[in-house]
Amino acid sequence: HIFLQGFTFGAFPQPAERVTGPDTLKSTEDSNKPPEPRRFFFDLERAMQPITDDVRIREIKELTPPSHVLREFVCSERAAQVTYESRQAIHRILHDMDDRLLVIIGPCSIHDTKAAMQYAKQLMGLRERYAQDLEIVMRVYFEKPRTTIGWKGLINDPDLDGSFQINKGLRLARELLLNITEIGMPAGTEFLDMISPQYIADLVAWGAIGARTTESQSHRELASGLSCPVGFKNGTDGNLRIAFDAVKAASHPHHFLSVTKGGHSAIVSTNGNEDCHVILRGGKTPNYDAASVDAACKEAANAALACRLMIDASHGNSQKKPENQIPVLRNIAAQIAEGDARIMGVMIESHLHAGRQDLVPGKPLTYGQSITDGCIGWDDSAQMLQELADAVKARRLVLETA
């Protein structure tokens, strides 16, 4: 350690002078002298220590606390009722108390809130038409897990330009969910991180944990505390065991780190979620057919779980070709019509217009068409919902006469 004069940091405060008697009184001459230079302490060893914290962080911005966003977009009585009733319906479907089919249908991801609202209004008519046979929930995905890189969703980059206005994205997401649920349409979404649920989860009727995160301990812990039913997808390679393990893990209490509505770091303790299930989404090969359903149910039995399966018509089951969702859904409908009660739900990627488009700077986007995975168009979507509703009716007849 060394002492330097005039150094700019690490200064020791000068001790206060004590006046105890005549001998300590300064003369006028002494008082006119310039003050002694202040002495500064400098830890040379510490100054030479390498920097090990935040070395790859370019910038840290403040995140608006969840409570602020919740006050801006208050959950209305109508939105709360719609969300609650759909959660209850899904609970009954999962526990074999309702023979309807849960259908999660909508765009691969939301990038245009206006198109999303138009889709929601059109879907609402079909939800009402098929209410006796289907519990239709709109797929409203704001976050996109990426295998490598790419646009990560409306919350992460709402302006689609790499500006990453996340505070804006969170507000847009909550506002859209509120608008959708207020017209009577329950919403489903994927939960990708530990913080964003505090901004939107009260408006979500059903949640998903994706294939890339099903094996993640933190996502299993999150699911154990979510207020909505949650589906776990099988792994990207088709591994079913990790999904059934996730369902078991999420059914138990957990303690983990998250944030409060006020935005403070917190320890969260959960009760466990009894409304979790597996989603067959394909992998190296599809797994939507009857043989795959049988295999999944054997895996469920090995895990001491009831076999209640949702089948994703897209992703690995469509081999990434959106038009393949139609034959996949017809195969699933045939299984249902033959009386298979183990299939409790399906997922469909659907938009106003079929296909997909690339996000190209400076190039206008086609309204109502996906910028992530390809989707089937509106007419095909409506047809598939009708066929699924007919399959549920047929299943009832088969089971009633069995």
Model-found features: residue ranges?
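Conserved phosphate/anionic-ligand binding catalytic regions in large, soluble enzymes, centered on
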Residues: 102-115, 373
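Active-site-facing alpha/beta catalytic cores
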Residues: 49-53, 62, 120, 133-288, ...
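Conserved, mostly hydrophobic/aromatic
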Residues: 106, 311, 377
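Internal helix-turn-beta structural module
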Residues: 351-394
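N-terminal polybasic/positive-inside topogenic patches
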Residues: 13-16, 21
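Positively charged N-terminal leader segments that act as targeting/secretion signals
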Residues: 9, 30-41
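Short hydrophobic targeting helices and cationic amphipathic motifs
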Residues: 3-4, 41-42
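N- or domain-start disorder-to-order transition segments that initiate the globular core
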Residues: 57-94
